[in-house]
Amino acid sequence: MKKHASSRSKSATVYTFRIESFSHEGRGIAHFGEFAEHPQTKHGKKVFVRYALPGEVVRAKITHETKRFEEGELIEILDQPSIDRIVPVCPHFGVCGGCSMQHITPNQQIQIKQHVLASHLQHFAGLTVNEWLTPVRSLRADYRRRARVGVRYIPAKQKLIMGFREHGSNRLTPIQSCAVLDQRLSQALPELYDVLNRLVAKAEIGHIELAMGDDEVSLLVRHLNTLPDSDITQLCDYAQHKNWQLYLQAKGSDSLKRVDRSGAEMRLHYAVPAFNLNFAFSPLDFTQVNATVNQQMLKLACDLLKLQKGEHVLDLFCGLGNFSLPLARCVGDTGRVVGVEGSEEMVQRAFENAAQNALHNVEFYSQDLTKDFSHHSWANQGFDALLIDPPRSGAFEIMHYIANFEAKRIVYVSCNPATLARDAGVLAQHGYQLKKVGVMDMFTHTEHVESIALFEKIQEIND
């Protein structure tokens, strides 16, 4: 793997360490004091070593120091490598900041994420995991369906750089391929670089965004100042050659403009065959980056809720209806699903998706979900089950309102174990029991943990 010294390095000192365990980010943890070369003043001090695995004895270069701990990067393994070590699949691993765990076996990656989730639940909520769900695994190595690729022109070198940020830096590392990006996108990166490099106003390009549906691809070019017509023509020629949708964006989302010549609908699409559903979305809409995990996640959420025909379900932070529509299929025509989302544009997209799928038992509302919503009519319909899929910040501000619904079952989908654990503590205080929890490998080879948890209301027993 490629490695370079951190720009924050205060020392080039190299030490020997025996790696004891993993950190939450997948780094190896060691302590000063075992080897004679360790300064006595550092004995007992914790060290985090990137790319080192438990059980390995390594040489590591210290790259960052604080009073409580130090950070280092692996230089060499002195004895047998860990059985959990594998060869990274990407030549850019170790420099590119996108992946952090390609050197770890998939099974060990899952175990690390389970440990992170369990320790957060115990630390923040005092909850113990009694039943683990079978991990939801990605079915493709090239799982990512969208990517933001940085573009920077260096006038002094007359050189264009296109790639991803380096680890711990704002610098871009040039990328010719990406092992975790859908190969239909990854294989296009070299020719896309050539197209951008030919532009007259290439210095005006800030970054590009690639997004995919099941069949369609969109290219969004973010630029600082107006591009000349000749550049737009070149971009349109390329989009036509690839049969891609092409968008330009100068400022905010309201400046998004489609400029390709296809005249096709301004949407991408993905299907969920298990529920006979099709979804439409725009390049700026939030969608899950891993299509195969999303498919499994939707089925798992519905299975955990054990929905019956005629039940009423509330879906908070519903987005474009990714969960709402499968839930509506489960409860049937006699049931009801209410989806609530902060973005009016996403609510409109959810309505469109429901109509496209001929679902009439679902309704959507736009509501700031960081504030009290208990006085709204939609919040007083009574719900048998609840699904919540908040952003990384979680839903702490409204957890006691959620608990007051007294739904029999709550499924909480999270991309942040810390906020899930914090919010789970509130549910526990309101009489909900954590029944099952699991990790979903939405972001393979990274430290990011996607999880799903089932809570059930405990029947109160009168003395």
Swiss-Prot record:
Could you say which EC number(s) this protein's record lists? 2.1.1.190
Q: Origin, by domain of life?
A: Bacteria
Its keywords, alphabetically, are: 4Fe-4S, Iron, Iron-sulfur, Metal-binding, Methyltransferase, rRNA processing, S-adenosyl-L-methionine, Transferase
What residues does [4Fe-4S] cluster bind to? 90, 96, 99, 178
Annotated TRAM domain ranges read: 8-76
Q: List the disulfide bonds.
A: none
One BP term from GO: rRNA base methylation
Q: Kindly identify the residues recorded as the active site.
A: 415
* Positions annotated to bind S-adenosyl-L-methionine: 288, 317, 322, 341, 368, 389
What enzyme class is recorded for this protein? transferase
Alphabetical list of PANTHER family matching this protein = 23S RRNA (URACIL(1939)-C(5))-METHYLTRANSFERASE RLMD, RNA M5U METHYLTRANSFERASE
HAMAP family xrefs: 23SrRNA_methyltr_RlmD
Query: Which family does the entry's similarity section mention?
Result: Belongs to the class I-like SAM-binding methyltransferase superfamily. RNA M5U methyltransferase family. RlmD subfamily.
Q: What does this protein's UniProt record list under function?
A: Catalyzes the formation of 5-methyl-uridine at position 1939 (m5U1939) in 23S rRNA.
Q: What is this protein identified as?
A: 23S rRNA (uracil(1939)-C(5))-methyltransferase RlmD
Q: Origin organism of this chain?
A: Acinetobacter baylyi (strain ATCC 33305 / BD413 / ADP1)
Q: What is the lineage of its organism?
A: Bacteria, Pseudomonadati, Pseudomonadota, Gammaproteobacteria, Moraxellales
